[in-house]
């Protein structure tokens, strides 16, 4: 299949329609509580809508995207959009990075310079990567699958096809959130040429509380924190995993409704986003424009519903695996990094204060050198079964570097 150049060109009429729809929003009454326990607060969303309508300029984001080499290619019947930036260094290691939900390739743009041109960012030529940044199927400018079955494993196989199509015979993979699940699947599949993986989302299956040994109050408090999230902070996951089509009608009809849905996925990042709009105090790169760039991309591409489908696909795939007696992992979801009971986790050290997507973790890991070392010693990472050892690579490399990587005040 051919690889075709791609440029973002949004008609002005679509931007005019977006502003009209925002202005026509039917607002509910203010929440009855002082926190966000009932959902996105009215004050935050009204200020976001005001800025979106009166001050925000999508063309800046469009220009930023079009400054990078973008392409599309058909894989398994779906058009896949991707950014492909080759380093000037001939010995650069190819790296495919995958975003998550509610994100997009926009959240990866700030990594392009440091990873492809490390000498300009405090590194040396040997730190360089050739970057491939695909949009997940049903996200951004990628096409929407027309049949079920596009869970992480199928996407992982598509990514291996993409890297092969680009001529890469040795490469590494990185991902966060949904991208972490896809990257983990790549590690388990171990396609020819994949040397190693790096993820910035830990996943684990936590035992039932009544089965836990009574070791300490801290252990049980940690289990309680996880339970609170899975019962009170898991709404987005449950809806998208069970009824993505139902919520999809609202996400494609109301830009403000879409914004609220994308903001309401975890408490810590929500409050940071709220600070950017209500207080005018962005945290790290969580600026008003960066936040709305991502929301606008979802709106203009009409992918609010199709992006949610991954959760449904994943739930069905996990259920099928359990029914077949196969192991399946379940994530703690997005949000803060929970203090997980140590009985259930072999790397129990707290890795940070929140769970914001952090693609720059790889950049901060000594300019990605741990992954480059995999490029030189990848043969050592393969078991006799030919699989990459997930127990080694499931842990973010930053966990070995105290004070590096997860920075609560640095934004994405």
Model-derived features: positions:
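Alpha/beta-hydrolase
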Residues: 1-16, 21-22, 26, 193-298
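Non-catalytic accessory segments flanking enzyme active sites
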Residues: 14-86, 91, 290, 299-321
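Glycine-rich "HGGG/HGxG" loop immediately N-terminal to the catalytic nucleophile
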Residues: 60, 121-123, 136-150, 184, ...
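Short beta-strand element of the alpha/beta-hydrolase
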Residues: 92-100
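The serine-hydrolase catalytic nucleophile loop
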Residues: 101-113
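Conserved hydrolase catalytic core segment
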Residues: 114, 118-120, 169-215
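Conserved acidic catalytic loop of the alpha/beta-hydrolase fold
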Residues: 153-171
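C-terminal subdomain of alpha/beta-hydrolase-fold enzymes, centered on the catalytic histidine
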Residues: 240-396
């Amino acid at each position: 299949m051919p690889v075709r150049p791609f440029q973002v060109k949004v008609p002005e009429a679509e931007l005019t329609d977006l502003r009209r729809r925002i202005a026509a929003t039917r607002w509910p009454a203010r929440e009855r509580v002082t926190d966000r326990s009932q959902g996105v607060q009215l004050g935050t969303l009204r200020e976001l809508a005001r800025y979106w309508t009166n001050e925000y300029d999508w063309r800046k984001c469009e220009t930023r995207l079009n400054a990078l080499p973008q392409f599309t290619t058909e894989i398994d019947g779906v058009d896949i959009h991707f950014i492909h930036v080759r380093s000037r260094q001939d010995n650069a290691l190819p790296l495919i990075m995958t975003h998550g939900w509610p994100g997009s390739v926009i959240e990866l743009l700030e990594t392009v310079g440091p990873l492809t041109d490390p000498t300009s960012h405090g590194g040396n030529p040997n730190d360089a990567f050739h970057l491939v940044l695909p949009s997940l199927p049903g996200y951004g400018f990628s096409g929407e699958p027309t049949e079920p079955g596009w869970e992480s494993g199928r996407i992982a196989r598509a990514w291996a096809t993409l890297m092969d199509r680009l001529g890469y015979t040795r490469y590494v993979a990185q991902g966060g959130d949904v991208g972490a699940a896809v990257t983990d699947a790549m590690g388990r599949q171990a396609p020819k040429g994949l040397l190693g993986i790096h993820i910035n989302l830990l996943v684990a299956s936590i035992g039932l509380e009544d089965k836990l040994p009574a070791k300490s109050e801290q252990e049980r408090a940690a289990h309680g924190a996880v339970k609170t999230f899975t019962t009170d902070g898991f709404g987005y996951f449950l809806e998208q995993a069970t009824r993505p089509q139902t919520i999809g009608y609202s996400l494609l009809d109301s830009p403000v409704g879409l914004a609220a849905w994308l903001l309401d996925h975890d408490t810590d990042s929500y409050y940071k986003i709220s600070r950017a709009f209500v207080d005018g105090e962005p945290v790290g790169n969580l600026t008003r424009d960066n936040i709305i760039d991502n929301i606008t991309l979802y709106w203009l591409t009409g992918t609010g519903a199709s992006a949610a489908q991954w959760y449904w696909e994943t739930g069905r795939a996990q259920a099928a695996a359990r029914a077949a007696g196969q192991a399946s992992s379940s994530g703690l979801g997005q949000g803060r990094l929970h203090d997980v009971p140590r009985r259930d986790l072999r790397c129990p050290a707290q890795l940070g204060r929140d769970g914001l997507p952090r693609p720059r973790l790889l950049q901060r890991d000594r300019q990605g050198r741990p992954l480059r070392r995999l490029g030189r010693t990848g043969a050592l990472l393969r078991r006799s079964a030919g699989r990459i050892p997930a127990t080694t690579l499931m842990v973010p490399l930053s966990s070995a570097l105290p004070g590096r990587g997860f920075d609560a005040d640095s934004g994405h």
